Amino acid sequence: MQTLDPVTPALLPLRRVTRPVQVGALTIGGNAPVVVQSMINEDTLDTPGAVAAIRALHKAGCELVRVTVPSLAHARALERIRKTLEDTYRPVPLVADVHHDGGPIALEVARHVDKVRINPGLFVFRRARLGDYTAEDVERARAQIREELKPLVDVLGAQDKAMRIGVNHGSLSERMLYIHGDTPEGMVQSAVEFVEICEQLGYHNLVISLKASRVPVMIAVYRLAAKLLDARGMHYPFHLGVTEAGDGEYGRIKSTAGIATLLADGIGDTIRVSLTEDPLKEIPVCYGILQALGLRRTMVEYVACPSCGRTLFNLETVLHRVREATRHLTGLNIAVMGCIVNGPGEMADADYGYVGKTPGTISLYRGREEIKKVPEARGVEALVDLIKSDGRWVDP
């Protein structure tokens, strides 16, 4: 279960208006919640391994799963993967990741997945050339893109399936680099070119991503894209992510810095936190970002002071015990405060409060109301009992 934070709409900028795009049973954009997605590491030719990885991600909360499709054989394997999922588990919305010379691969895989991701810099792959680009060269390149893209657009449109135009900073076409340089403008124009062709072909089931590995570049390009595309009436949803963010604490910090900044601006409709780790570890970070911004409530929101000389109990230990006892609940705000100074005032928005009163004694609050004082040794147990008495407890 998830809820929206009632405080958030009044504090954050209005969310960018985007057209809803259907991806299987999911909706990306419009008024739909921000969608969480990830990508499996397994070879798509390994059907049992791929199915197991997709299931594990989906059970962990990943709503949209991407798989790599580097060849026609991999594209055909998606038929087996999808059927196995439906027969042994349940339908899971799938995205196929297509890159170099992607036309034939994308056409095949479009039959088996809900969305196809193409990379504008590689979809019609041409080796770098020497010399200038004339206007005729540019128009010839656009004609080649249209020729390659039209069959895919026709197939996807006939099935009401989606496409992600996924621009990467590190793989802009040589033509775009020549015209615009290695700039956010070049990334945006790379996406705009493909959007224009799709629109000319009457296809609008589009999601757009513009990823970079440097957070300032990523933020700048999405902000520019929102401005330029919206000015042209291209109100397509955005997929946010910092590509190649790395691992560990810093990888999470980089992803959060980029994704959360844009979401706080009202930009973004689906997110992926890309880590050089097991993809399962990406999912809690995604939901943590959305929870912190109040965009989705999928867990308890904990408020706790950082501790100081006034603290009347071991705050770190008690917070851990409270979290372990209540972490399975959804939509509650629980505050753990070390003393009365930071207690009632700082936890005014909390549903329940656990506050140090005197040495060895804590006070439990419901909202702003002090309910009872109990020995510290029984504090967590008494908090659980209070939640149960209010009918807001569910067994884990």
Swiss-Prot record:
Gene3D superfamilies referenced in this protein's UniProt entry, alphabetically: Dihydropteroate synthase-like, Sulfite Reductase Hemoprotein, domain 1
EC number: 1.17.7.1
Binding site for [4Fe-4S] cluster: C305, C308, C339, E346
A GO biological process held by the record: isopentenyl diphosphate biosynthetic process, methylerythritol 4-phosphate pathway
Leading EC class: oxidoreductase
Cofactor note: Binds 1 [4Fe-4S] cluster.
MF annotations from Gene Ontology: 4 iron, 4 sulfur cluster binding; 4-hydroxy-3-methylbut-2-en-1-yl diphosphate synthase activity (ferredoxin); iron ion binding
InterPro entries on file: Dihydropteroate_synth-like_sf, IspG_bac, IspG_bac-typ, NO2/SO3_Rdtase_4Fe4S_sf
Source superkingdom: Bacteria
Protein name as catalogued: 4-hydroxy-3-methylbut-2-en-1-yl diphosphate synthase (ferredoxin)
Organism field: Gloeobacter violaceus (strain ATCC 29082 / PCC 7421)
